[in-house]
Amino acid sequence: MLHLLKKYAFKDITMSMLVDECRINKTTFYRHYSDKYDLIEKISKDYISLFSKASSNFVNGINVHNIDCLIQFFDDNKDELLILESKILPINIFEDMHAIMTLDLCTYFKKSINQDDLIKLYASLISNNILTTIKWYHKNYLNFERNQIIQIVLQTVETGLEQSITAIMKKGKR
């Protein structure tokens, strides 16, 4: 399926294309999947399961190791995730990732903050920031080293976006 998604829009992929690409007959395909929607959902769930393992570290905090593990997940699955992000699909794997990471961060914040709405807001904002930064890095990684991205994520989480940009601007004037 992912190989076909490199070339075609999801809506244009036919059952014949799938069975030809997989070199199986329709009976074998239908034994495992009800249709192409079921197949893409199962593919997505496989990546979500792997992501969940990497994200689960965030229940213990936001640090270099945890961000590095998340970047490693994206490195290991870069091509596939970029395909899943670039196409119009009946699933949104990145929304699912955001929801998982937000829950992990909520678990962490509940250890020291006692306001559920505030916890959910901050966890969602931080999760979006981390995931957006890592996705951007994987599209533009030639311009940045991995450690730079980790430091940018940490700095924006710890001090806020505006202060992070101001610090970078001050360094640039030296």
Predicted regions and their residues:
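Amphipathic alpha-helical packing segments from all-alpha helical-bundle domains
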Residues: 69, 88-132, 162
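An amphipathic alpha-helix adjacent to DNA-recognition modules
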Residues: 2, 6, 11-23, 30-60, ...
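Short, hydrophobic secondary-structure boundary micro-motifs
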Residues: 14, 82-84, 93, 146
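Secondary-structure edge/capping motif, primarily at the C-terminal ends of alpha-helices
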Residues: 58, 81-84, 109, 137-141, ...
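Hydrophobic alpha-helical connector segments
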Residues: 54-82
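Cytosolic nucleotide-binding catalytic cores of signal-transduction proteins
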Residues: 6-8, 114, 118, 133-139, ...
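Short hydrophobic clusters on alpha-helical segments that form packing/core surfaces
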Residues: 1-5, 51, 74, 101, ...
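C-terminal peripheral helix-coil segments that are non-catalytic and often amphipathic
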Residues: 139-174
